[in-house]
Amino acid sequence: MKRTGAKLAVYALEEIGVKFTFGIPGVHNTEIYDELNKSEKITPVLVTHECGGAFMADAISRTTDSIGTLMIVPAAGMTHALSGIGEAYLDGIPMLIISGGVRRDTGKFYQLHQIDQHKILAGITKKSFLIKEHSEIVPTIFE
């Protein structure tokens, strides 16, 4: 049986020792939240604002042996989290940010939450990845 992208992502997060994720579920990341809710190793913490979630993820990296992980929707979710992401980056604190994406196989542009996140994040992250195939999920998270 093939694994979904969400199952692969949660598997990889468990393998690297993530204990908590912080964020807000939305149409672009519902499946991964469904899988996080099944995990016995990871507790998804729902927040009321993405920036607060970013600061919480920062705190986990600063105070535990786990990497702080932010789980957000694209565009508005990512832009709301920028202050917390930038703070972690400037202090050299590791943070893993997983953002949902928009479909790219329809030929339609200007979809809900379509924005060039990689360009925006370039100055305040060490790396940014665009996963296009299921086979890229686990190796990318391990990196």
Regions found by a protein language model. Give the residues of each.
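N-terminal alpha/beta PP-like core and its mobile active-site loop of ThDP/TPP-dependent enzymes
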Residues: 1-143
